[in-house]
A protein has these predicted regions:
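N-terminal helix-turn-helix DNA-binding module of bacterial transcription factors
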Residues: 1-63, 356
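Alpha-helical recognition/docking segments in bacterial nutrient-uptake
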Residues: 1, 63-188
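Generic structural signal for helix capping and beta-alpha/helix-loop junctions
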Residues: 27, 59, 74, 125, ...
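Bacterial carbohydrate/catabolite-sensing allosteric modules
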Residues: 44, 103-113, 155-162, 167-356
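Short acidic/polar active-site loop segments enriched in Thr and Asp
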Residues: 16, 62, 137, 196-199, ...
């Protein structure tokens, strides 16, 4: 079956081709009711706009795509906000994605492909994600980047690999890391090897599947050790950044005023843990003598901070490399059964938990 075209969308939605084009190129210029009708027709048909006005099924581009979430719209950001963001360099997703990008670039070059990268600002076929999908032969998407219904549309026309998080669409190839196993081993290390009993966990939003999996691993370790098992993280961060690490650490210390502090704080990622180190130093709390601190991810900065950060290292570059391999395999054999990979993680012992 041939790929649906702009003509099909126009006919189904009862508008002109020019109107369909405006919906994708300048959506604010089209009345909301008309825009919704066009987008609904596009979803129903499985239409993905091609940036080069070419049918996705007709030829290859020699390009693979990666899309990861972006939590700030650069078009709405003021100059002052942009300058502050650049100075802080505090985006956990950017640091995490950078390692995945490096892995994808290396593997793509081996196969003679270029890599096109996009930060998703919004869902829907009119979004940047769909525009990128029209320019690539295959697409890797980080969890929570594209709404499931929109991803279903895109995946009808080109191979898609989901990275991180649980498998949400059964027919798509999928790669994740052993988040729960890694956090469980980290908590066991603090309990068994350092004799720590009063632990606190700072997680992310419930919508973050990786952060939730890490919390479950923490719960399992506490249960095994006969420690109290919390139903919820001690605190949740709205965004897993250094700033949120500082804020949540201050909140935990304030909450413990007049009673025993936690002996260790486990953070759902490295960026928050690094923010915690800043907060604890500011408040005169010694790490690890007074409170141990741990993270998760193994970003390069975790080696540089003082004290160096104990963390769970996930193979971020390998995640990118495996994504390319799955896309290449899917392009060669579109009908093969979907693949789901679980990549192992490793515990990195450093000074922030008391290891030499």
């Amino acid at each position: 079956m041939s790929a649906p075209t702009v003509y099909d969308v126009a006919e189904r939605s009862g508008v002109s081709i020019a109107t369909v084009s405006r919906v994708y190129r300048n959506p604010d210029s089209v009345r909301a009711q008309t825009r919704d009708r066009v987008l609904e027709a596009a979803r129903a048909l499985g239409y993905v706009p091609s940036g080069n006005a070419r049918g996705l099924a007709s030829r290859t581009t020699g390009v693979l795509g990666l899309c990861f979430p972006d939590y700030a719209d650069p078009d709405a950001e003021t100059d002052a906000e942009a300058e502050a963001d650049a100075e802080a360099d505090d985006s956990a997703v950017m640091l995490y994605s950078d390692q995945i990008i490096r892995g994808m670039e290396r593997a793509a070059r081996r196969h003679g492909y270029a890599l096109l990268i996009a930060a998703s600002l919004a869902g829907g076929p009119e979004s940047l994600v769909a525009k990128v999908a029209g320019r690539v032969d295959g697409f890797a998407v980080l969890a929570r980047t594209v709404p499931t219904e929109d991803l279903e549309v895109i995946s009808r026309r080109l191979p898609v690999v989901m990275l991180a998080g649980p498998r949400e669409i059964d027919h798509l190839d999928h790669i994740e890391v052993a988040n729960s196993d890694g956090e469980r081993e980290l908590a066991r290390h603090l309990i068994r090897d350092h004799g720590l009993r009063r632990l606190a966990f700072v997680g992310g939003l419930r919508e973050s599947p990786d952060a939730e999996a890490r919390f479950r691993g923490y719960q399992e370790a506490c249960r095994e050790a006969g420690l109290p098992v919390a139903d919820e993280p001690d605190l949740r961060a709205e965004m897993m950044t250094q700033a949120e690490g500082e804020r949540t650490t201050d909140a935990l210390l304030d909450r413990a005023a007049g009673r025993e502090r936690p002996q260790a704080i486990l953070f759902a990622n490295d960026q928050m843990a690094i923010g915690a180190l800043h907060a604890l130093e500011r408040r005169g709390v010694r790490v690890p003598e007074d409170i141990a601190v741990t993270g998760f991810d193994g970003i390069p900065m975790s080696r540089i901070v003082r004290p160096s950060l104990t963390t769970v290292r996930q193979p971020m570059r390998r995640l990118g490399e495996e994504a390319v391999e799955l896309l290449i395999q899917r392009l060669a054999d579109p009908t093969r059964d979907p693949v789901s990979l679980m990549l192992p993680v490793s515990l990195t012992h450093r000074a922030s938990c008391g290891c030499p």
